[in-house]
Amino acid sequence: LRTNLFKLCLALCLTVGVHTALFAQTRPDFTGVWQLASPPMTSAQGYPELDLTPAGQRKVDAYRSLVDPVGDSPTLWCVTHGMPEIMMGGGGYPLEVIHKPDQVTLINEWQSETRRVFLGDRIESSESIFPSRQGYSTGHWEGEVLVVETRHLQEMVDSRFPHSADTVITERFSLTHDADGTPRLVADTVMHDPLWHEAPLSYRLEWTPSPLGWMQPYECMEERWLERLDELATQ
């Protein structure tokens, strides 16, 4: 009897394991170097419209009063874009995606700004997470769609999309193909900030494979250091 029960349990485990493996194989692999299918978003082409609440507008106005008179910006100080702007292809820089079973890593060529999407057991407890410009991203699968939720974002007034620390960004990543077979990475995104935004911000981003197929190194601080050396040499 014990032998028969053992065989039955083994058969069930193997069946579940094979089913899990086959299901995992149906999930798309987003690995690759991608570029936006349309030109990078600019103010001329039209960013998604964002309506600020009075509280959000006061925060942004206070920030603008500091930087506008001197023409300063975080870019001049090599500050990374953060979410959600990192995904919008500013400057036309490509995006590299490294897809593993427990983590999806997204690297923007500009400043090598990096996001990590943790899956399954990789997810940390809230107590161990510090707010940041990129936030903390976790993901789960809904069929062939990877649903990514980003929380723990720090308050940002210096972004094209200013937001409070209560912001939650949800992205739904999927893989489609054009008529000629060209793969297309799609991210349907919703940004929700109950404190600073009058309504959720929704938009779609699409990428196709980068013709170059790899990314150039980018070191913002080194360039500023070389400029500083030139200044010292002329003094």
Language model region names:
Residues 7-21:
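Bacterial N-terminal signal peptides
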Residues 24-235:
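Hydrophobic small-molecule pocket/channel-lining residues, especially in calycin-type beta-barrels
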Residues 1-7:
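N-terminal secretory signal peptides that target proteins for export/translocation
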